[in-house]
Design a protein with these regions (language model features):
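Beta-lactam-recognizing serine transpeptidase/beta-lactamase-like catalytic domain environment
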Residues: 1-2, 7-167
């Protein structure tokens, strides 16, 4: 879930969707008009009211509303969109085995607009982008990949291949 927020924060900074001064008022929920039926509104909730949040607070306090805007767009924030979120998750190898020296390693899965159309016979909606932006929905990653990715965040960006040691 929320463990992918630092990755998407970096993507948002790189793509100039947000900068270190961008602030979003996170009052507990946002409402978005349906893309199919304009008389319907969907509510996307946060786990608490956070108030004004910049990217640092959004990562530190896991501010879902900031990441809804960062990923799917809201208000004045254009959003990364599904294609950019997919791009950065795949650049971080979220959909690939880590290469650890163990047989049968599983891969994660990064959903895309094309995958949803082909598999679920449905369009990609803003709610899908919101779910992806907080690490939910159809995204799956392995615990080992999470360790590898967070290690890269901690060590300045070097993605290390995990391995086993004797003892």
């Amino acid at each position: 879930g929320s463990t992918i927020k630092p990755l998407l924060a970096m993507a948002g900074l790189k793509e100039h969707v947000v900068d270190e001064h961008t602030k979003i008022l996170a009052e507990g929920a946002i409402q978005v008009q349906s893309e199919v039926d304009p008389s319907v509104y969907y509510t996307f909730r946060d786990w608490k009211v956070h108030g004004w949040s910049d990217i640092r607070k959004a990562i530190a306090d896991s501010v879902d509303i900031f990441f809804y805007a960062l990923g799917g767009g809201y208000g004045d924030i254009h959003g990364l969109g599904v294609d950019n979120m997919e791009k950065y998750l795949k650049l971080a190898r979220a959909d690939q085995p880590t290469g650890i020296d163990l047989p049968g390693e599983a891969s994660g899965f990064v959903p895309s607009r094309a995958w949803k159309r082909e598999t679920k016979h449905d369009a990609w909606y803003i709610g899908d982008s919101y779910n992806l932006s907080i690490g939910q929905g159809d995204l799956t990653v392995t615990p080992l990949w999470l360790n590898m990715y967070i290690s890269a965040v901690a060590n300045g960006g070097k993605l290390m291949k995990p391995g086993l040691v004797e003892n």
